[in-house]
């Protein structure tokens, strides 16, 4: 019996040993780790990795060009394919690196234990430990160890893609947070640093993606038509894949998912500038390029043929004028120089115009278009024909026979025609004069006799003359009808009566905002009642209003003696329609009638930041956490203007009265009347007309008219110090004889007494809420504020660095140099040729009236 038991025991142990060995050597049976706790770490030397459930993705370290990176790749794909790189622009210089959780952040440390990458979580619940986890879909997340709710992830790699879009990732905007998720190519095939190409969603009208090289558009995807992007006909429905476009109040994004997990599929922006869909077939073990965009080097090039022309690969030349249009420059057109595009043969007369139907078209660029998804193509045609500025219309969605309405009121650009047997493209209806419609019909009809032809021509001429005589009467009737409709739908239609009243060098066609009838604004504000007055400044008055549907608005009414003249007003109108960010005020429309010029904005319940910082009643309601969040929000909004929007925009009048607060105390930058658009390669500009608010102007701008992104950075620095101290830079005075806030803060900083500048309201609240006040966070804000107001522009950080410094707890922030003290200007006019210098020991006094107001964007 004893021998039998030994044999049994020996057999059992042998079986157990074999089983363990099989687990260790067989990948399918191996047990992988997909989480990293606060007590664990990954190092290059250990060669440890995290592997997702199902063993599809793996996170670890890799080396290329003698540099080390933390990244993610497909585990089962023999050809190593990277889909995400954490420290792409901050590689490790040697084989010493550690990934760990520190201070509720996921941190990558180099050989000297300095962070080179982290998750930028500024605050977390210290009582609840966090873990990093690699999910089955390839999302690398940070979460509370006891909470698996995806909506409450603290951080996730899906929000910060590099060059690859995986299934279930989203590419586009999170409107709640202002986060824009876009792709940036590798520098080269073996260099993962940020390359020259980006693939980013623009949402100004119909959302569409732009492939850009160093922020200059190279290719446009075309708008989403309910099935696919109209400019990517190759992206067809597949049996193993479902893709969708999400557009609601919370997000605008593209995503796809796999219905058959035996295939891997990804969208990648490669370093050569092509956006590709690649699918891995396990049986043949290769990545198959399903499609690549752009396809054609001519017709897929952004605005290849200029305005009012379309590209067709089946014609020679490939560029063709739309029917009813001729080349703008015949000589250049014959030389295959098409950038000038085409012009109308016959100008539109408003009444009597018609449409030509262009089939299988990639719709024109929609940044200047208006969209109404509630109506069909018939109503869309009526709306277009009643708007003298309408140049074309189309369906917004081609499913189920078509629905929705897109109307263009600007020139038509970047159009392409697809082959007659192509499944892509859609109908585009372009507005033509009656004479050009007739030419088309005659060309396609039978040859008629000369007598009949002359008769028809005479009839057409008589008809056109008769129509032209009735043009004013027709326009007046349309205006009355629009007024009636506008009373019911004041924000959904363009109103035409204001067009006749507006005169000046600016054309009505240049406006990109819905026009609101004067009568509607008068009713909304109760005839501009003083009870609805929100604020007043040099530009005029801001009123609160309420539309018939109950929507509250803010109306910025320029006075006839406004310091913001027609130039600034038109600048604001044309600029703000192109901007969309959670930290920018949303414009709803404008009203131009006679001498009246008004902008209509969303109404923000908490008015302007200065009413909280400097007002007696509201000041105590602004605790430190709210001040810190407001500072971060303004920084993100300014970063969007400088870097992340389609245009580089210099605000030039950033101040606390231009920071508005919504009901959730989210800050929104307003007032773009003085803003300027910079080219991507433009670093600074100068002007003889210095505008803005003294106290917020940088020295180089106030004295020499030189402005740049660093001018806005200076203004932001002043705002930061005002938020921390609760004191105005202008008119500041204290017993130590510092006559501006910057001098006061700088002196306290040098003496190591920086916390003395903190608003007493915050200090007084410590007894009831001691946990809210965080001295290190306050000191960091003061230091960043001083960095932003340094005297020399080249010493000031870019807003990208500012946002980075605010978001990191472990970053070593540089020590600031002295600020630019001289921020005021002599009250006397200076000869433009004269020069004057700023003396650090000299004070300037300006007899100039100023009023803090709510100033909508």
Swiss-Prot record:
One of its GO terms (biological process) is rejection of self pollen. Glycans are attached at residues 47, 120, 196, 260, 389, 442. GO terms for molecular function: ATP binding; identical protein binding; protein serine kinase activity; protein serine/threonine kinase activity. Predominantly in the pistil and anther. InterPro entries: Bulb-type_lectin_dom, Bulb-type_lectin_dom_sf, Kinase-like_dom_sf, Pan_app, Prot_kinase_dom, Protein_kinase_ATP_BS, S-locus_recpt_kinase, S-locus_recpt_kinase_C. GO terms for cellular component: membrane. Residues 33-446 are extracellular. Residues 1-32 form the signal peptide. It is an enzyme of class 2 (transferase). Residues 35-155 form the Bulb-type lectin domain. It is found in: Membrane. CDD domains: B_lectin (cd00028), PAN_AP_plant (cd01098), STKc_IRAK (cd14066). The keyword Kinase applies. It catalyses: L-seryl-[protein] + ATP = O-phospho-L-seryl-[protein] + ADP + H(+); L-threonyl-[protein] + ATP = O-phospho-L-threonyl-[protein] + ADP + H(+). Residues 350-433 form the PAN domain. Residues 467-857 are cytoplasmic. Its EC number is 2.7.11.1. The keyword Transmembrane helix applies. The chain crosses the membrane at residues 447-466. PANTHER family: BULB-TYPE LECTIN DOMAIN-CONTAINING PROTEIN, INACTIVE G-TYPE LECTIN S-RECEPTOR-LIKE SERINE_THREONINE-PROTEIN KINASE SRK-RELATED. Belongs to the protein kinase superfamily. Ser/Thr protein kinase family. Involved in sporophytic self-incompatibility system (the inability of flowering plants to achieve self-fertilization), probably acting in combination with S-locus-specific glycoproteins. Interaction with a ligand in the extracellular domain triggers the protein kinase activity of the cytoplasmic domain. This is Putative serine/threonine-protein kinase receptor.
